[in-house]
Amino acid sequence: SSKTEIEIKDFIKELGINLPFICENGSAIYNLDLINKKLPKKVILSKNIKSISRLYREKVPLRIRKKIIDLRKINDVEQIKIFGLPKNKIKLALKRSFTIPIKFNDDIKDKKKFIKIIKDTGLKIQEGGRIMNLGDNVDKSLAMQIFLKNVKTFIKDPIKTIGIGDNHNDIGMLKNTDIPCLVYSESFKGKNIKIKNLIVSDKPSPQGWADVMKKAVLKI
C-alpha cells in the first residue's frame, strides 16, 4: 500500500485482525513473523526520511524547490482537500518514515526536470492521484517479490497473488501479480495499460474494489 505504517495498523485494528503488510509504496514490510516465527517482524527496504530530505535539499536547485509544496507543512483545511481524508485520518497519513508527500506547482517542463534530478539522485517520484510521493528507489512490486521470497521459504504450496490498484504507482505491482485488478478512477482511467488478463471495474472506489475482488477470487 501507499499508506503509512500507522494508517495500516489503524485499519487492521478496525478489522480486528493482525496481518503482514507493505507500506509507503514498498518502503518496508511488517509482520512477516505472523506467517512463521523465523521470519523477521520488520524488513526495511528504503532510506529513512531524514536521508531522503537531505538528498532532496542537496540535489534539487532552490529555483525548483520553490515550486514544490511539502504537504506536511500546509494547513489542515488544504490537507483535507488534497488528501480527501477527515482530519483524524490526515494525522495518520502524515506520520511517514520513508516518503515525503508533495505537489508540484508549475509547468510540466520543470516537473519533468525535477523528476529527472530525483531519478539521477537514486530516489524516486511515485504519483498516486492527488499527490506525488518522494522516496527511495523502491516500489510495491519489488517489496511484493521480497515478501513472496520470504514466505515461500516456509510455505511450499502454490501461491496465487492478487493485485488491486487504481493509479500510476500500482502499475508495476499489477504487472507482477497473477490476478491483476484495476479499479476505475476519474484521475487515472488506465486506457493504454497493457496487462494480460487485467480485471477492470466499471465503478470507482469503494464499490469498484469490492467488484474486482469478487471477480479475482473466482479465478483462484
For each feature predicted by the language model, list its residue ranges:
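Active-site phosphate-binding/coordination module
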Residues: 2-72
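Short hydrophobic/aromatic-enriched beta-strand-loop microsegments
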Residues: 18-24, 88-90, 180-185
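Conserved beta-strand segments of alpha/beta enzyme cores
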Residues: 20, 67, 124, 197-199
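Conserved acidic, metal-coordinating active-site core of Asp-based
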Residues: 63-162
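Hydrophobic/aromatic ligand-binding patch that stacks against planar heteroaromatic rings
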Residues: 11, 79, 172-173
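Mg2+-dependent phosphoryl-transfer enzymes with acidic/Ser/Thr/Gly-rich catalytic loops
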Residues: 131-220
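Short, well-ordered alpha-helical microsegments
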Residues: 5-9, 111, 141, 170-171
